[in-house]
């Protein structure tokens, strides 16, 4: 078993970061995620948003893994459960693979919280527990997978920034459009009065 952990601070408020987290896929930084399906989404009695999603991924595999499972590329599935608490301002996301569970399990947990000293920033804490089963090189493969998870976490943070930029651009466009539609009737009224 290998445990990987990381912490990152986003220079954006919690509301922005959690909105981006829910819209993270697809993105150009991680093209291996080829599909996201929402299986269930509801708000509980306390106002928390619960989501259960299925992520479809397609990976190119290292040569040692290819020889073990006999494939060069493989489609895998990950189930993801998230809970967003708008009152406590926390988002917890747990994911686990549901493909190849007889060979490997990857359990990941992400927590988004406002930065304790700066409400305009958000702290992301990540943890992944990797277990390779029934292979003599299990420890080596777990280390290799931890390295891949670390690289993908960096890509994930880049993707979050990309989504946030995209969301901000959409907001600016809507704001400009709304201002234009407000000015048009006002300009017409001013023209009629002359």
UniProtKB/Swiss-Prot annotation:
The gene is PRELID3B. The lineage of its organism: Eukaryota, Metazoa, Chordata, Craniata, Vertebrata. It comes from the Eukaryota. Coiled coil: none annotated. GO terms for cellular component: mitochondrial intermembrane space. The modification Phosphoserine is found at residues 46, 51. One of its GO terms (biological process) is phospholipid transport. Belongs to the slowmo family. Keywords: Phosphoprotein. GO terms for molecular function: phosphatidic acid transfer activity. Residues 1-172 form the PRELI/MSF1 domain. This is PRELI domain containing protein 3B. InterPro entries: PRELI/MSF1_dom, Slowmo/Ups.
